[in-house]
Amino acid sequence: MSLFLNFIKTDRRCRSKFITNMVLKGFLGFRKFKQRKKRGELFPAFQFISVTNDCNLKCQGCWVSSNGQKENLDIEKIHSVIEESKKQGSYFFGILGGEPLIYKQLFDIFEKHPDCYFQLFSNGTLFNQSVARKLRKLANVTPLFSFEGDEQV
């Protein structure tokens, strides 16, 4: 019940975009995915986009190399992937890194595609009031924080 109450208390714009982009388009997108699958057409129901391999942490065991060359995915390539996905009925994206909040054009992606729903996978160390305000204004992004490590996190 508290989940429902929290959902009702959520910013109206965020709630509306969530229902439209995640629930409605998610349902329709999954339906289209099943139709494509029956026809033998392979295209995923949702995509994960790793926008950068740069990170502000050096976690033991992480695939992101702290000594390697920092690379960012070209913004036009990202927009192209998203546009092609929308043509296929897919409006759900996971945004990953490294640490995606390091990616300078991150919010441009969310702004250019208000008809999509994004989950932002972050270590949370760069998340602040400014980021929270931007995400609330955009209303099409849910931040997800990973906490990995031992007791000294």
Give the label of every model feature segment.
Residues E71-L73:
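Rieske [2Fe-2S] iron-sulfur-binding domain
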Residues I75-I95, Y103-V153:
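Radical SAM/AdoMet-radical enzyme domain recognition
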